[in-house]
A protein has these predicted regions:
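Non-catalytic C-terminal accessory modules of carbohydrate-active enzymes
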Residues: 1-170
């Protein structure tokens, strides 16, 4: 929980492109480098060989890890809760989410090289206090800036507002 470095390492382990960085690795892995494998062999002679690439929901789980837990964009009641948990080396992340009524152009700035800790959340330049940014309904994009830093501002999590512990944070 709150360990962006570890979350990124787990993501990299599951990301199929990491299994196919050179010709020898591609020949060993034997499945598509653009599809998440549901399993990777662990017993000889199949150690490291991918399998079951098109038959499961593995890609959806990898997507959720990357977007919802590392980048920290989680859908919530007509908007998006923004709680990044990123590697220290990520100094900036830009994401645009589009919906029929309008989108969110989100920039996460990490000048202090921290993993978590929202110090400022601005929507169209105005401070947002509750951590959930609503989607616009006017067909335009809203510009959102999230600043991370060592002086964490107290932005309540959804589960804190209903009094339950947060067990699902990266």
């Amino acid at each position: 929980m709150g360990d962006g470095e570890r979350a990124a390492r787990v993501f990299d382990l599951l990301n199929p492109i990491g299994q196919t960085l050179n010709t020898a690795a591609v020949q060993h892995y034997r499945v598509e480098p653009y599809v998440v494998a549901a399993d990777v062999g662990g017993a000889p002679p199949y150690v490291g060989r991918g399998g079951w690439t098109w038959y499961t929901g593995s890609a959806a789980w990898l997507w959720r890890l990357g977007i919802e837990r590392i980048v920290g964009l989680r859908p919530e009641a007509g908007g998006v809760r923004i709680e990044p948990c990123i590697p220290r080396s990520w100094r900036r992340v830009d994401v645009t989410i589009r919906r029929p009524g309008g989108g969110l152009a989100i920039t996460i700035e990490n000048p202090d090289g921290v993993e978590t800790g929202v110090t400022e959340l601005l929507v169209e330049g105005v401070p947002e206090g509750h951590g959930v940014v609503a989607f616009p309904a006017d067909g335009h994009d809203r510009h959102v800036v999230v600043r991370l830093g060592s002086n964490k501002r107290d932005v309540p999590r959804r589960d804190e507002t209903i009094g339950t512990p947060n067990a699902a944070t990266a």
